[in-house]
Amino acid sequence: MNKEVCESFLNVWEVFPDKLTKNNGYHEINDGNFLNSYCGSYSCDTDLKKIDAGFFYLVNKFFGASGVFKNNAKSNINAVEYIIIWLSHMLNLKDKQGNILTNFYKVYINNQDKYKNTINGVEGCSNYDDLIYKKNELMKITNEKLSKFYAPFKSLCEMYSIFGDDNKNCTKCLEKAKEFVEKYKELSEDYSITNDSSCNKILCTLSNDYDNFKKKCKDSSSFPTIDKPNITPKCPEQTSEQNSKQIHVNISTKNSEQNLSYAVTSEDAPLSK
């Protein structure tokens, strides 16, 4: 995580807010909205197309030919976790049942031309689809559970967006740091989270990025520390690329958008390419 990554999320939050309107709907993406160019045929006429536009923008912004990580994609692959957490939160605003992420992947990402954009530097990944699939274990977490990581992620990202090379005084981030640690603590004390190896990896990514933020500050002595006793195995000092298990099942290419209204339960087949 860095300032540029979080500014990209801020760009999305400003034009496509992460909460519903007063009428309980997603915000519109109009012609003047930069995300409109990421909509298929320049038309985001459904809620899921709006979410897909934001998702594709973030993937392209980070890993595209002129993206944030164009020269070091491998060492920053964990940014994909944050994009998927954003996706989970946006889907969870209306559908809180099961694992809708799996169906979203099948319909909007897998075998879609725009996700075939090539990338370099990540072993086993030739395009965006491969990169996302490398984190496929996250899509097997129920959407309700995965979206719980969104609040601490956003607090941390807001800290990074304030901080920069021209502003290493982190006193303005203290309240956000307290907010992050409080939300992180809630997750680390949730047995359903800590008993899940995939969730533990996300906790590690968050805690490492928080600790890395503190190291960059001129004075972070007043920042609260993170207690990690419940995380197993122990988090590595640096976030690293995690290998995804390759589980082979058939994916139907005939899914329609309507399929997404039905949550995927734990009894459904695992995600595969």
What are the residue ranges of the model-derived segments?
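N-terminal targeting/regulatory segments, especially signal peptides of secretory
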Residues: 1-269
